[in-house]
Regions:
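Cysteine-centric redox/oxidoreductase cores and disulfide-bonded domains
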Residues: 129-237
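Extracytoplasmic thiol/disulfide redox context detector
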Residues: 2-133, 184-201, 206, 228, ...
C-alpha cells in the first residue's frame, strides 16, 4: 500500500514538475523583452533557412488561389498543339516561358525528365515573350506551328539551336515546316494577349513561371521542386 502511495506521489511530483516547467517557459516567452524574442526568431530562421521561403510560398499561394480557381480552364487548355504528355492527364503543369530566357532553357531538361518519368502528366506551354523582338517572333512562330500540330518540332529544335535570332528561328521553322516569318493571325495575337493578362494576374515578374494545382512557382525551381508539387496535387486527389 505504501509502495503504491509512494509511486503515486512520485508520479504526481514528476507531472507537477513538468507542468511547472512548461508554465515557467510560457511565462518567460510572453514576458520576454522584444529584442530577445526577435533574436530567438532570427536564430530560428538562421538554423532553418527554408522557413522563410516556405512561408512566402504559402502566402503567395493563398493570394493567388482565387485567380487560379477562376482561370483554371484558360490556364490548362492548350493553344493548338502547345502541350506534351498525357492526352487524359492526372496532373497538368503549366509553364509560361520565353525562348530567350536562360532560366527557361535551364529548366527544360527538368521538364522533359518529368514527362519521361510520369505518364499521367501533361505540360501546357504558354508563350510569354518579354525579352525582345526575337522572342516575339519566336513565340508567334511557335503558335503558328502549334495551329498546324507541329509545336513539338519547332519548340524542341529552337531550344537546341540556341537563343532566338533570325538564323536559329529559321532552323526551327524549317523543322516544323512553316515559313520563317510570322503571319498576321488574330488568334495568335489573342493568345499572346491572354497569356500576358494571366501572367500579370498571377504576379509574374519574369520567366519561367510554373503552375500546378494551387501552386505558382517563379524561376528555375528545379526538378525536385516540380516533382514535389506534382506529388502534392496527386495527394490532394
Amino acid at each position: 500500500m505504501n509502495e503504491k502511495r509512494g509511486s503515486s506521489l512520485m508520479t504526481a511530483a514528476i507531472a507537477g514538475g513538468l507542468i511547472g516547467s512548461l508554465l515557467t517557459a510560457a511565462l518567460l516567452i510572453f514576458a520576454m523583452p522584444e529584442y530577445l524574442s526577435s533574436r530567438i526568431v532570427r536564430q530560428g530562421m538562421l538554423a532553418n533557412p527554408n522557413i522563410l521561403s516556405e512561408t512566402v510560398d504559402a502566402l503567395r499561394d493563398q493570394q493567388y488561389a482565387p485567380v487560379l480557381a477562376s482561370n483554371r480552364r484558360a490556364l490548362e487548355t492548350p493553344f493548338g498543339s502547345s502541350w506534351k504528355g498525357a492526352e487524359k492527364p492526372e496532373v497538368t503543369l503549366v509553364e509560361f516561358y520565353d525562348y530567350a530566357c536562360p532560366y527557361c532553357k535551364a529548366s527544360n531538361p527538368s521538364v522533359d525528365r518529368l514527362l519521361r518519368e510520369d505518364p499521367g502528366l501533361r505540360i501546357v506551354y504558354r508563350e510569354l515573350p518579354i525579352l525582345g523582338p526575337d522572342s516575339v517572333v519566336a513565340a508567334r512562330l511557335a503558335l503558328q506551328a502549334s495551329k498546324q500540330g507541329r509545336f513539338g518540332q519547332f519548340h524542341d529544335t529552337l531550344w537546341k539551336a540556341g537563343r532566338p535570332a533570325p538564323q536559329t528561328i529559321a532552323v526551327a521553322a524549317q523543322a516544323a515546316g512553316i515559313p520563317a516569318q510570322p503571319v498576321k493571325d488574330p488568334a495568335i495575337e489573342a493568345e499572346l494577349k491572354s497569356n500576358f493578362q494571366l501572367a500579370g494576374q498571377l504576379g509574374a515578374t519574369g520567366t519561367p513561371v510554373f503552375i500546378v494545382g494551387d501552386r505558382v512557382m517563379n524561376g528555375a525551381v528545379g526538378y525536385e521542386a516540380l516533382k514535389k508539387a506534382i506529388a502534392d496535387v496527386r495527394a490532394k486527389g
